[in-house]
Amino acid sequence: MNVLSAALTEAMTTSSADLVVFEPETRTWHRHPWGQVHLRAQNVAERIGQDGSSAVGIVGEPTVEGVAAILGALLAGSAVSILPGLVRGADPDQWADSTLNRFANIGVTTVFSHGSYLEQLRTRDSSLVIHDDAEVAHAQRSTTLELGAPLGEFAVLQGTAGSTGTPRTAQLRPDAVLANLRGLAERVGLAGSDIGCSWLPLYHDMGLTFLLSAAVGGTETWQAPTTAFASAPFSWVHWLTESRATLTAAPNMAYGLIGKYSRRLTDVDLSAMRFALNGGEPVDIDGTARFGTELSRFGFDPGALSPSYGLAESSCAVTVPVPGVGLKVDEITVTTEAGSSTQKLAVLGHAIAGMEVRLQPGDEDAGVVDREVGEVEIRGTSMMSGYRGEAPLDPGEWFPTGDLGYLTDDGLVICGRKKELITVAGRNIFPTEIERIAARVKGVREGAVVAVGTNERAVRPGLVIAAEFRGPDEAGARSEVVQRVASECGVVPADVVFLAPGSLPRTSSGKLRRLEVKRQLEESKG
């Protein structure tokens, strides 16, 4: 038993609180005491022990059995890797092949899934053992499972962009994950009376951390599938009302969407909410402030708004404000070749316990005037051991995040990114991976594809693919690009723009000018 499995066991077996899970078909919530969830997790841990798996893959919705599968892997001392399910527009066979290959490539040997996801995965030829989590986790236990030595070194294998924008897997040890959970709990002031409510995907570090915080804290949490929010976004606010949640978390786009259309809301009571984390993507000041103002008529305290900073390499949280501070804004002047302009940026709080932040000065200051801008570097107890397949990160070593920022008395401010990531709905997406996949489509010119994020601070940021194309069937090729990217990357492009050969802007050395492509696309959209 490692420190994380011991903490989970102690909390779940002594807690009187519940895990409350949303059932999409009936649109009802179902309570499961943490003690019962622990028994289900023991069943999963036992099966993993029989398989001898040091790394376990999870695919599916956050059913009680799905949650038990995650916790069971952690109880067994195995590393858990969670991947997205099938998304709209994806080819089922391509998705299943891609998912199983991704698991195999990071050392996963046992997979847990359920329902249609399970059925599709089992149609593919794979050496991985694939279990039905509903079957394994639902079995009755007559004895308490005696946990032996951990089956592996790591607790979480988290997909990430890395500091260079290259797809990587962060390897997180049990002590690092637990340190992050405890540091976050201390900053938030987590108490036994707190109630969480989340629809965040568990394959995202923010969603997984929100769930594990409740499990380790033994507190009540309400967990809905991301698909339930996507199909009816205003459900989130009604879930907060029904649960009397004190804690929630979401990416910027969710706060912007609800705030923009809040006039549609009725019968809402958010007076219990004391901490609403905003993370995973750049913070839109106006949209976030509007959420606080508009929802205050339903009892929401704008002081609960908590823009924060984190990344998978640090388990999740790095800087988080103290509850009650609310949205803090720093106004800056930015100079470019076109002149000067002012921008308002969110202050993201100070480092949680065990973590440190510093700035590494460089040439890239993002044009910010009167601020000491540098690349954000972090270190501390929550840090990963390193990326899979690469040299380990030495304890105490400063890790360059690729983000540009500066420090104020109220905390960290992020003003730009060195790494060319695309952020959609809180997810970091890798341009090179999308471009490689799109280039497989007949007629699309290899090496002449650019994937960019557009309107990143808007309510609905999107992924746009621009490619040079030559062929008779543009419509068919466009559909195939969407299908392939959806299947293998788990995100549906907002648009695919085909251009004549030679149209994409390049540098004198022949490199594609991504920022110029992004600017042209945004201008063309008006």
Curated annotation (Swiss-Prot):
<keyword id="KW-0007">Acetylation</keyword>
<keyword id="KW-0547">Nucleotide-binding</keyword>
<dbReference type="GO" id="GO:0006633">
    <property type="term" value="P:fatty acid biosynthetic process"/>
</dbReference>
<comment type="similarity">
    <text>Belongs to the ATP-dependent AMP-binding enzyme family.</text>
</comment>
<protein>
    <recommendedName>
        <fullName>Medium/long-chain-fatty-acid--[acyl-carrier-protein] ligase MbtM</fullName>
        <ecNumber>6.2.1.20</ecNumber>
        <ecNumber>6.2.1.47</ecNumber>
    </recommendedName>
</protein>
<dbReference type="InterPro" id="IPR000873">
    <property type="entry name" value="AMP-dep_synth/lig_dom"/>
</dbReference>
<dbReference type="GO" id="GO:0005524">
    <property type="term" value="F:ATP binding"/>
</dbReference>
<dbReference type="GO" id="GO:0070566">
    <property type="term" value="F:adenylyltransferase activity"/>
</dbReference>
<dbReference type="InterPro" id="IPR042099">
    <property type="entry name" value="ANL_N_sf"/>
</dbReference>
<dbReference type="GO" id="GO:0005886">
    <property type="term" value="C:plasma membrane"/>
</dbReference>
<feature type="modified residue" description="N6-acetyllysine; by Pat">
    <location>
        <position position="511"/>
    </location>
</feature>
<feature type="modified residue" description="N6-acetyllysine; by Pat">
    <location>
        <position position="260"/>
    </location>
</feature>
<dbReference type="GO" id="GO:0008922">
    <property type="term" value="F:long-chain fatty acid [acyl-carrier-protein] ligase activity"/>
</dbReference>
<keyword id="KW-0067">ATP-binding</keyword>
<dbReference type="InterPro" id="IPR045851">
    <property type="entry name" value="AMP-bd_C_sf"/>
</dbReference>
<keyword id="KW-0436">Ligase</keyword>
<dbReference type="InterPro" id="IPR020845">
    <property type="entry name" value="AMP-binding_CS"/>
</dbReference>
<comment type="pathway">
    <text>Siderophore biosynthesis; mycobactin biosynthesis.</text>
</comment>
<dbReference type="Pfam" id="PF00501">
    <property type="entry name" value="AMP-binding"/>
</dbReference>
<comment type="function">
    <text>Activates lipidic moieties required for mycobactin biosynthesis. Converts medium- to long-chain aliphatic fatty acids into acyl adenylate, which is further transferred on to the phosphopantetheine arm of the carrier protein MbtL. Shows a strong preference for palmitic acid (C16) and cannot use short-chain fatty acids. Proceeds via a Bi Uni Uni Bi ping-pong mechanism. During the first half-reaction (adenylation), fatty acid binds first to the free enzyme, followed by ATP and the release of pyrophosphate to form the adenylate intermediate.</text>
</comment>
